[in-house]
């Protein structure tokens, strides 16, 4: 813990409160407690890539964590072999734009568009039952089957999540180990919103369960927030 009493071992982040709700039973109303000998806190960063990036940057300064794990739900691309109800552990997070996938737009060459998850965090989540997967972060939910197929093919991504790249980039800028555990709530495409509404709560709870099974392995005392 930091000299100011702020720093935590593990910071769990999510786009909005329902994705953290299953943690109240173990972290309490203040969303902070000691679990397995670790100081664990949970905070909301906002919905969508811009809000999540800004919200994460603010929480890193305020909470000074040793490690971060993003929680939430995602959609699986057709052909990924990943099913609704699975939990994935992010291996790589990629910023994706449909126009780029179509070949009618380009990201500037110096622009960072890919961030790898922290290897130890990935392995801990896999041991806890999550499946390693590559995550595409789009600006909006993909609700067209052909568009979803093109994005998956062009980026070799397995799942789609709106906030992952924003959180990962903010962590990378601060040198904070990043991981993500996401419950699969839907297939990406025309039925995405309908399926998500039906499954998002159970999918979010499954992601939380995976993290709680490996809390000690997700927070490293050797990787403190730079001061």
Functional labels for PLM-detected ranges:
Residues 1-3, 56:
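Glycine-aromatic micro-motifs
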Residues 5-11, 40:
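Extreme N-terminal starter segment of soluble prokaryotic enzymes
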Residues 9-29:
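N-terminal beta1-alpha1 ligand-phosphate binding loop
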Residues 32-226:
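Glycine-rich phosphate- or other oxyanion-binding loops that anchor nucleotides, phosphorylated ligands
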Residues 3-5, 35:
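Generic structural signal for beta-strand residues in well-ordered domains
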């Amino acid at each position: 813990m930091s000299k100011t009493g702020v720093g935590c071992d593990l910071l769990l982040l999510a786009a909005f409160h329902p994705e953290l709700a299953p943690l109240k039973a173990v972290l309490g109303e203040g969303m902070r407690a000691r679990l397995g000998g670790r100081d664990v806190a949970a905070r909301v960063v906002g919905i969508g890539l811009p809000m999540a990036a800004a919200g994460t940057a603010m929480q890193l300064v305020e909470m000074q964590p040793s490690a971060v794990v993003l929680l939430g739900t995602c959609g699986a691309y057709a052909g990924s072999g990943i099913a609704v109800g699975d939990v994935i552990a992010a291996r790589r997070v990629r910023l994706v734009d449909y126009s780029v996938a179509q070949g009618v737009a380009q990201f500037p060459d110096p622009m960072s568009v890919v961030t790898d998850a922290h290897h130890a965090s990935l392995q801990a989540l896999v041991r806890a039952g999550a499946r390693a997967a590559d995550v595409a972060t789009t600006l909006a939910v993909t609700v067209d089957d052909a568009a979803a197929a093109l994005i998956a093919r062009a980026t070799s991504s397995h799942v789609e999540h709106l906030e992952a790249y924003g959180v990962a980039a903010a962590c990378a800028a601060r040198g904070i180990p990043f991981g993500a555990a996401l419950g699969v709530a839907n297939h990406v495409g025309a039925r995405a919103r309908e399926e998500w509404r039906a499954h998002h709560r159970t999918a979010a709870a499954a992601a939380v369960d995976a993290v709680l099974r490996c809390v000690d392995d997700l927070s490293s005392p050797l990787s403190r927030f730079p001061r």
